[in-house]
From Swiss-Prot:
Is potently inhibited by 5-fluoro-2'-deoxyuridine 5'-monophosphate (FdUMP), but in contrast to ThyA, is not inhibited by the folate-based 1843U89. A 5-alkynyl dUMP analog has been shown to highly inhibit ThyX (IC(50) value of 0.91 uM), while lacking activity against the classical mycobacterial thymidylate synthase ThyA, and therefore is a selective mycobacterial FDTS inhibitor. The lineage of its organism: Bacteria, Bacillati, Actinomycetota, Actinomycetes, Mycobacteriales. It comes from Mycobacterium tuberculosis (strain ATCC 25618 / H37Rv). It comes from the Bacteria. Was identified as a high-confidence drug target. Crystallographic studies have shown that NADPH/NADP(+) binding expels both FAD and dUMP from the active site, by competing for the binding site. However, the location of NADPH binding might not be biologically relevant. Binds 4 FAD per tetramer. Each FAD binding site is formed by three monomers. CDD domains: ThyX. Pathway: Pyrimidine metabolism; dTTP biosynthesis. Pfam families: Thy1 (PF02511). This is Flavin-dependent thymidylate synthase. Its cofactor is FAD. Keywords: FAD, Flavoprotein, Methyltransferase, NADP, Nucleotide biosynthesis, Transferase. Its EC number is 2.1.1.148.
Length: 250
């Protein structure tokens, strides 16, 4: 029976910052938040911190977000390695064009033992889960049968890598949308804020909403001042949403 895959989001990279030694400025933050502040102050050469309300990094970044000076947020980035996510969910994810992606290739990686991601609407129903996993098993059996026949069909292809690729890219047509995929996603702070505003909404599909909220929690640990305006709440159905009055970019 097909194994199910839980969502897992792992932080794998974040911006470092090296302050220029010839600039008369210090800050109480490091990494991406420090870089964002530096970029903002570079616009106005406000190294002396003339405004007490923006003298701290948190105060400065909150002001940046309040006034909509979002371009400076684009200098700092975070990368996640995401597993336990369905192919149907990544079809929505990759519509966010300001991110960079590197995704598992079904042309090079065989899917005979691929896991499935249970849609949120089926998680609490054993009968529905059983129907789903049976369908996934049938699809994988058909995939394996097609793969064997396609490899035989392309047996005259002398390049073994190309032969297997040709077979897999045709056989994958029968794999379900619930098939697990794995993907590296990199985005700058502005892009992540936009993603969360769009996909942590109650109007988003629950699977990608869960992804957005888990990313938000980890982003808030990396750059609290940049993401602190988002509030996570629970709806009547038990699912979570995240909203912010300052997330103004549609």
């Amino acid at each position: 029976m097909a194994e199910t895959a839980p969502l897992r989001v792992q932080l794998i990279a974040k911006t470092d910052f090296l302050a220029p030694p010839d600039v008369p400025w210090t800050t109480d933050a490091d990494g991406g938040p420090a870089l964002v502040e530096f970029a903002g102050r570079a616009c106005y050469q406000s190294w002396s911190k003339p405004n007490p309300k923006t003298a701290t990094n948190a105060g400065y970044l909150r002001h940046i977000i309040d006034v909509g000076h979002f371009s400076v947020l684009e200098h700092a980035s975070v990368s996640f390695y995401i597993t336990g996510i369905s192919r149907s969910c990544t079809h929505e994810l990759i519509r966010h064009r300001h991110f960079s992606y590197s995704q598992l290739s079904q042309r090079y990686v065989p899917e005979k033992d691929s896991r499935v991601v249970v849609p949120p609407g089926m998680e609490d129903d054993a009968d529905l889960r059983h129907i789903l996993t049976e369908a996934a098993d049938a699809a994988r059996a058909t995939y394996s049968e097609l793969l064997a026949k396609l490899e035989a069909k392309f047996a005259d292809q002398p390049n073994a890598i190309l032969r297997r690729k040709q077979a897999r890219q045709a056989a994958r047509a029968v794999l379900p949308n619930a098939t697990e995929t794995r993907i590296v996603v990199t985005g700058n702070y502005r892009a992540w804020r936009h993603f969360i505003a769009m996909r942590a909404s109650e109007h988003a599909d629950v699977e990608i909403r869960r992804l957005a909220i888990e990313c938000l929690r980890q982003l808030a640990a990396v750059a609290p001042a940049v993401f602190a305006d988002f509030e996570v709440t629970t709806l009547a159905d038990g699912t979570e949403v995240a909203t912010s009055p300052l997330a103004t970019e549609a």
